[in-house]
Each structure stands twice: as C-alpha cells, then as structure tokens.
Amino acid sequence: CIKNGNGCQPDGSQGNCCSRYCHKEPGWVAGYCR
C-alpha cells in the first residue's frame, strides 16, 4: 500500500493508501495519503 505522505489518486489508479484515505483538493493533479 502507499504510505502516508506519498502521492495517490482518490480513484485508486495509483494504488491504495495504507490508511485508506487519499487527500486531494480541487485543482490538484494528485493527492497524498494521510
């Protein structure tokens, strides 16, 4: 899984966060796990 602080996409296209939460705000190209 993707560790906290690393890049992710909410739709899971880049893998799943260990925390299961990908934080992404409007306008961001990518989010990050937290």
From Swiss-Prot:
Pfam families given in the database record: Antifungal_pept
Localization: Secreted
Domain of life: Eukaryota
Disulfides per UniProt: C1-C18, C8-C22, C17-C33
SUPFAM superfamilies documented for this protein: Gurmarin-like
Gene Ontology annotations for the cellular component aspect, listed alphabetically: extracellular region
Keyword annotations: Antimicrobial, Disulfide bond, Fungicide, Knottin, Secreted
GO BP terms, alphabetized: defense response to fungus; killing of cells of another organism
Function noted in UniProt: Has antifungal activity against C.glabrata.
Family, as annotated: Belongs to the AMP family.
Domain text: The presence of a 'disulfide through disulfide knot' structurally defines this protein as a knottin.
The protein, known as: Antimicrobial peptide Alo-1
Source organism: Acrocinus longimanus (Giant harlequin beetle)
Lineage: Eukaryota, Metazoa, Ecdysozoa, Arthropoda, Hexapoda
